[in-house]
Amino acid sequence: VPQAKHLLIGSTRSGSGKSATILGLTYNLQAKGYKVGYGKPIGTFTTKELPEAAERSEADVEFIKQTLSLPQSLLRPTLLNLDRSALQRRLSGEDTADYSDKLEEYKEIIEGDIVFLEAPANTAEGAIFGLSLEQMAVHLEAPILLVMRFGSLLVVDHILMAKRRFGDRLLGVVINDIPDEQYETAIEILHPYLENQGIPVFALMPENRTLRSVSVSEIIEQLGASILCQPENIDLGKIMVEELKIGAMDVSSAQSYFRKSYNKAVITGSSRIDLQFAALETSTNCLILTGRPFVNEDVAHKAMELGVPILAVSKDTLSTVSIIEGCLGQVRLHEGVKVTSICEMMGKHFNFDRFLKLMNIKTLAKV
């Protein structure tokens, strides 16, 4: 029986879009009739030492499993969660396990045409356990697909260094989050350059504001906010916020300032009724009030009419901004609108024929 082919999905920094890439690839390959497996050998480490880090890592695994209806037979177990206590046990000599042996057991599971293994946040993480991206690629004799956020044309340096490091193990790259104004440059200059360096480019993905947005229900959860006004028949999990604006100026300046942004949340003081009205006259998806948890009756009426929820937070403005910006900077997959967007984008921009050929997976007859 032929063994399932493993492919490591890695990146040089966290937040590059590995989980999203796996989701989009799996969905589209399933639609083509392939049996796809998934695993995350090493759970996510967080420098902030959030107690829910391991849970979040597990939640991502669980979410991908549920969303793609993956049976247990197609899942590879997580070998450890990379947190402070795991590191301390390793450093003190209490944990002497050979994780490469545990990784070898993946090879014995034959179910699936291809198995995507999500690597740690960057190329170094997990090395103390023998589970860095490169170490896993060697143990499993598996190729690496590198997922990179564009940032700027300087992304090429990181890709070239990865090629030097991984050599022929680097199957190719996916570059995502390319701003519209740089997309043509990426296609006409970056793509051919990388191909000439022997680095296959499977996809150049344009920036997608939906993916970097956050739902109002997620904002409520992260801020511990209370709801002062919730329009009827509005699902807060489906109202997406793409930008954040702070209202602390005079009202005439505020109007032009607010008009420049779409699908935004506006943070302002509960006493600034003038700014609340100004925000509601532009493309605002959520009002967040600081200070006294109070909303003016006329503002509430207008918000109900427009379908805009109003929240109250007890935190100061700076902390509130910091938390929401953290949410906006990360692609949290757990929202249906994002899943649909990812799967459609991957179907449109990813070169599946070339990918399957380089993975030596035979093309199935079209269903």
Label for each model-derived stretch:
Residues 108-111, 255-264, 279-283:
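Flexible, charged surface loops at secondary-structure boundaries
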Residues 1-4:
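Phosphate-binding P-loop
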Residues 119, 199, 207-269, 325-367:
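Non-catalytic interface/targeting segments
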Residues 88-129, 134-138:
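Phosphate-binding/switch loop-helix module in NTP-utilizing enzymes
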Residues 7-16, 20-97, 106-107, 193:
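N-terminal phosphate/diphosphate-binding loop that engages ATP/GTP or pyrophosphate donors
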Residues 9, 37-41, 74-76, 115-119, ...:
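General beta-strand structural signal in soluble alpha/beta enzymes
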Residues 120-203, 208, 270-334:
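Conserved catalytic-core segment of NTP-binding enzymes
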Residues 27-35, 62, 66-73, 108, ...:
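Generic secondary-structure signature for well-ordered alpha-helical cores
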